[in-house]
Amino acid sequence: MSESSFSLYAGRGNPNWTATGPREAFHALGYFALDESRRVWTADNLGGTPERRGIGERFDSWVRRHPQLPGVELLAACVQYALARWAFDKDEFVHELADAVTGGTYPVPGRMLTHAEHIVRGYLGFEMFGTRPPKGDMSLFATEGAAAAMCYVFDSLVKNGILAKGDKVALMAPVFTPYVEVPELDAYGFEVVEVRASRSAGTGVRQWHYPREEVAKLADPAVRLVCAVNPGNPPSPVLGDRVAEQIKEIVATANPRLLIVTDDVYGTFVPGFHSLAADVPRNTLLVYSYSKHFGCTGWRLGVIGLHDDNVIDEMIADLPQERKDRLARRYRSLTPEPEKLRFIDRLVTDSRPVAPRHTAGLSLPQQAMMVLFSLFDLLEEGQAYKERVRQIVRQRLELLLEGARMKTADDDRRAGHYVELDLLAEAERVHGKEFADFLEKTYEPSDPVFRLAARTSVAAPPGGFDGPEWSVRISLADLDDMDCLKIGHHLGEVFREYVAEWTRSPSPRGPAGEAGHPGAAR
C-alpha cells in the first residue's frame, strides 16, 4: 500500500490543535511594528527600523486606538505581565518585540535576545521546575526545535573534547528514534549503553518503570552521558522521584561528571512535572520544544538550558593544555580570553562554522513567537489552555481503549501525548501465554499493523523506539476523538481474526469459537 493510499497516519507526533490566542497576539504585534516602521520612513512598500525612544508609550496609545484588532488585548496583557514581573525598561522591551517581529536584523545576542531569555527562563522555571527550582540561574540558547538542539549538544561536546569516539553514552530506552540513531553515526561512534525500562503487566497497556539495577548502569564512570526523554516517548510516564533520587545519588558519589541531556517536551502534559534539570542542575542540559504544547511544530521553536554553575565548564577548564590551546585558536576571534568562553556560548558558535558565526541564533520572528507563547502560558488564559489540552489527550486515550476493549491502570503521571499498545502483552493477559506464543511463532510483529492498514487505510506504525516489537504506537495528539475510537475498534477486529485462526489451528488450547479480545464486544 502506497503512502498516498493511507487516509490517516496515526503515529505523527505533531498535535492537531493550535494555540490561537498567542498567534493572534503575534499578528497584532506585527501590525504595531509595521506602524512603527512606517512612522520612521514611508515609501512605496518601504519602511524603516522601529525607533526605540518613546516606543513604550506609543505602544499603549496604539493599543487604545485598536481595541477591535484580534489579539491586541492578549498582546497588551502579555506586555503588562512582563513589565510587572521583570521590571523591564518599557522602551527597551517593546522595541525588542517590535524589532524581533519585523525580522530585519541578526539575532543579538546570538544565543538569545535579552528580554526573551528572561521570559523563556520564567516559563521553563514555572512548567519544568514547579515548586522546587534549583538555586542560581540557567542560561538559554534558542534553537530550531529540540532535534536541532540535540544535534548542537552532541556536536559541541565532541568539538570541545568532552566526548570522543568510543565513549559510552547511555540511553533511557524506549526513546525517541533520533536519540537511538545519532550516537551511532560514524561522526560520533559512541558505544551505546541502554538503560531499559521494564514493563509491569498491570491491566491492559503495560506500565513502564526503570528498575534500580538498570539505572545503576549510570554509576559506571565510563558512561560519560545519558539521554532521557521525560516524560517518555512513545510510552509516556515520567521518570519519577525514585529514579531522579537514584541519579542524584550516582552523580553525588560514583559518577560526578555524568552529563545528562533531558528532553522535556512533554512535561507540560503532566501535573506537577519536575525536570532532572532541577534535580541535578550542574550536570544537566535541558532541551525543550514548544511544538507539542502549543501545536507549533512548523515554527521550529526550541531551547537549550544550562545552569550557570555546571560541570561542563569545569571539564573544559581541566582539559590538557594542548587541547585548550587548540580550542583557544578556534574561539579567539570571539573574545580576547577564549579559555573563559562558557560552553553555552560555545554551543552558539559551534552551531555554525565559526567564521560565519554572525549567522548563528534563532530568527527574530521565531523568538518573538516564543516570547508570546511563554507569556501566554504564565497568564490565567494559558493555564486554562494547558488544562484543556491535557483533557484532550486523556479523553482520546479513553476512547482508544474503549474501542479496543482494553484497559490501563490509572496514572495521572502519564503525559498521554502518545500511547504504545503492547499487543503481545494484551494477548497474554486476555487469552493466556499459549495464545501469545502462537502469535509470536506464527506471525511477524508487524502483521497486526499491516492488517489494520488493510482494513482501515490507517497507518499506525510499530512501536519502535527500542520498545517491544509487538506494539503499535498511536499519537493521541494528532487524531480526532472518533478516529481514536475507530482505530481501537479495528484493532479489536484484528485480534478477533487472530483468535479465530488460533482456534482453527492444530490442537489449540484456547476455547474454540471464543470471540477474540481485545476488541471483543461482550
What are the language-model segments listed below?
Residues 1-76, 502-522:
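Conserved N-terminal helix/loop that builds the PLP phosphate-binding region
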Residues 13-18, 147-149, 175-177, 231-234, ...:
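Short, solvent-exposed loop/turn segments at secondary-structure junctions
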Residues 16, 277-339, 473, 484:
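Active-site PLP attachment segment
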Residues 20-26, 105-108, 199-209, 235-242, ...:
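Short, flexible/disordered intra-domain loops and linkers
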Residues 47-255, 267-281, 285, 480-482, ...:
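Conserved core of the PLP fold type I
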Residues 325-392, 400:
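Structural motif of enzymes handling amino- and sulfur-group chemistry
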Residues 365-376, 383-401, 408-437:
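Conserved glycine-rich beta-strand-loop-beta hairpin in the small C-terminal domain of fold type I
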